A protein has these predicted regions:
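Short helix-loop-beta junction
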Residues: 3-15
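Glycine-rich beta-alpha loop elements in corrinoid/cobalamin-binding modules
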Residues: 19-209
Length: 209
């Protein structure tokens, strides 16, 4: 968050950081007023479910990524909760971009240990317009540059390191590999394993698709 924020500041943008806001209502998300360009959301340095629960699914008493190791300052599935509260606060026309470790690892259909099921991409449940995965410095600055030019997120389809939902996969700006559907990987463990293998094989930033 700090690195990306400083990068945006270096480009001349004003950045407000709302750390661990009260997620019980949308009011806290309006603390700095309405953003001019958009809202960037991250869940922290660790997946919120890993931070909150042990491998035995017991609630942790401490959160090492919160002030004073105090637990309970972030919600479960923080990216989804924060994105939905931001949408509630600012409306359907506000660009909402999610990123960070939690979003990056959940951008595809994925097995969720705590629910013991395969969940769909976090883009669906968060309602975000776009997901930035990996380190994100270049992508976030490029997104901000285009938003400043009034280019809608729906037209940003050629920024490396981003993911989005579309009903027109044939219009992808890059060579693509089609993975099995969520329904298929939920019902077939072999297809799930093959999809995961393909995802990892295509991570290479030079030759990956």
């Amino acid at each position: 968050t700090a690195v990306i924020g400083r990068g945006l500041e270096a480009d001349g943008y004003r950045v407000s950081v709302l750390a661990q806001p009260d997620w019980h209502s949308a009011e806290a998300f309006s603390a700095f007023g309405r953003p001019r360009l958009g809202v960037l959301i991250g869940a922290g340095n660790l997946d919120s479910m890993v931070a909150h629960y042990t491998a035995a699914k017991k609630r942790r008493s401490e959160d090492f990524y919160s002030p004073g190791k105090r637990a309970g300052l972030r919600p479960d599935r923080a990216t989804i909760v924060y994105a939905n509260r931001a949408r509630e606060a600012f409306g359907a026309d506000m660009p909402i971009i999610i990123g960070g470790l939690e979003a990056s690892l959940r951008r595809f259909a994925h097995y969720d240990y705590w629910e013991d099921k395969v969940r769909r991409s976090i883009l669906f449940d968060s309602g975000a317009d776009m997901l930035v995965y990996g380190m994100g410095e270049y992508a976030e600055r490029e997104i901000a540059r285009r938003l400043k030019k009034k280019i809608p997120v729906s037209e940003m389809r050629d920024i490396a390191g981003t993911a989005y939902l579309t009903a027109e996969p044939d219009k992808c700006a890059f060579p693509a590999v089609e993975l099995p559907s969520v329904a298929q990987v939920r019902d077939n463990k072999r297809l799930y394993a093959e999809a995961t293998r393909t995802e990892y094989a295509e991570h290479d930033p030079i030759r990956g698709r």
